[in-house]
């Protein structure tokens, strides 16, 4: 048979946006968009342009799924993915300008990234909550599933 990659690699342990999106979250999607979007748009020769293309594609794809499900334009998915795209690109550009990846102690880096993710999570999980009409406990459940805790 065809070997399938793991979908997640301990997302709560991500140290930065690039680590989260490139090595820990939805690895099948990451590998697919790397091959079909990132590389054709210039890959490592044009990383800002190529990464922007991946995040714009992801934003539009997620927003389309929300729009079809809710029957209206929402916009939160677009904002979520554009914010995360900018954060990932800024982290990468800043690291390259230093000549190395920004290196903080693991607990500090993980905590900073976790706070960033929690701060932006309503933009991602809010539309999902609206689609499934989940209330009260839904944020905890959705976040726990997304983080691989359930």
Model-derived regions, located:
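Interfacial helix-loop-helix junctions of multi-pass membrane proteins
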Residues: 66-77
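Short amphipathic alpha-helix initiation/capping segments at coil-to-helix junctions
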Residues: 75, 79-83, 104-108
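Structural signal for the C-terminal ends of transmembrane alpha-helices
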Residues: 90-95, 125
